[in-house]
Structure formats: C-alpha cells, structure tokens
Amino acid sequence: MEATLDGTELRVLGSLVEKDLTTPEYYPLSLNALVNACNQKSNRDPVLSLDESQVTRALDTLRFKQYALVSGSGGRVAKYRHALVEKFRFSPAELAILCELMLRGPQTVGELRGRGERMHKFSDLSEVESVLADLAERTPSLVAKLPLQPGRKEPRYCQLFSGEPDLSELAAQMEARGAGADGEKIARLEQELSELREEVASLRETIAEFRKSFE
C-alpha cells in the first residue's frame, strides 16, 4: 500500500466504515461518537481504549492520506466519514469484508461471512471468496491469504492497509490467545470443581444429621 496505516488509524477507519454500513442514520460521526465506536467492546479485537487526542491525530493522518473527510464549519459540530468509496470504488460487500479485517484482524472465510452479515448479506461462502479474490487482485493488493496454521483446517485472510503481515508476530498472537483461552478454561473448571466439593461436603453433613435423627 502506498499509504500504510498504524493500529490506531486502522481502528478509526474501520469504525467509520462500520457505522456507515450498520447505522447510516447516525453517520457521519462526531468526534465523541467516533471515540466510542473505536473503544466499543463488541466486534473488536483487540479492545482498545483510545482518547480524543489519539483519535484526532489518526483522523488528521487519514485525511492527509485521503482516507477520511470532515464536514461541519461555522460553529457546527464537525462530523467525520471515510472516503474509501471515492478513493477505491468499493462495493458494499468489499467494504464489509475490509471492515471486519480492520476491526478484528485475520479471519477465515466462514468467520468473515458470519461476522460481516450485519453489514452486508452474503449469499454463501463462495461470494465471500469471490470478494476476497477481487480485493487480492487489485493493484496494489488489499488483502492477502495467510499460510495455513498447524492444527487448523481453513486459511485466514488479512487486510494490507497496515502493510505486509508479520507472520511470526501473528503466530505469537494466536498462541497467546490460545493460551489465554486455555487458562480461562482451566480456571473455570477449577471453580466448578471447588463448587462441587462444597456441595458434596454439604450433602454429607445433611446425610449425617439425617442418620442421627434415627439413632
């Protein structure tokens, strides 16, 4: 890409696209609404905590790179919107796929179809694959297919607005997420085991008292 985006710029741009497609009645966005969109916990990976100054700096860069526009002057509240349709002539399906990749990182075809449904209704997986192929064939390419990870059946795709992917970093992130999920599962099982032990102890006490009543 001629204008590579950093993580904050990518989150801001993805949030603008998402709100354009999901809540057009509230779009373009004020700065406050955009900050909230960037920091929301649903449909985000990772969840961020950006402040207004960070979002403003990202907006300035996106405007300079012609990825975003601002409207409102003369005392009116400034509103921000993305300029991807004007710049790249994206279809709604392409916008939905790119938005998901910007907001959640690399994903499989199935994940993109399921998660992208809120922005564009895909007829089937082949439509998603077709959109990904079109984006990959652009000059320069806008998405890339990642090598299949060990133990996984489906490859994932990533966006290239933030540059070529660092495969070693992506692998480390996936391992960390897997370890975190395993840790949460172990903690949950330990909690359930502790609760079961308490229930068994309580039941034994009840049985002992019941037997005493017949002695």
UniProtKB/Swiss-Prot annotation:
It holds the Pfam family DUF480. InterPro entries: DUF480, WH-like_DNA-bd_sf, WH_DNA-bd_sf. It comes from the Bacteria. Gene3D superfamilies: Winged helix-like DNA-binding domain superfamily/Winged helix DNA-binding domain (1.10.10.10). SUPFAM superfamilies: Winged helix' DNA-binding domain. Belongs to the UPF0502 family. This is UPF0502 protein Gbem_0102. It comes from Citrifermentans bemidjiense (strain ATCC BAA-1014 / DSM 16622 / JCM 12645 / Bem) (Geobacter bemidjiensis). The lineage of its organism: Bacteria, Pseudomonadati, Thermodesulfobacteriota, Desulfuromonadia, Geobacterales.
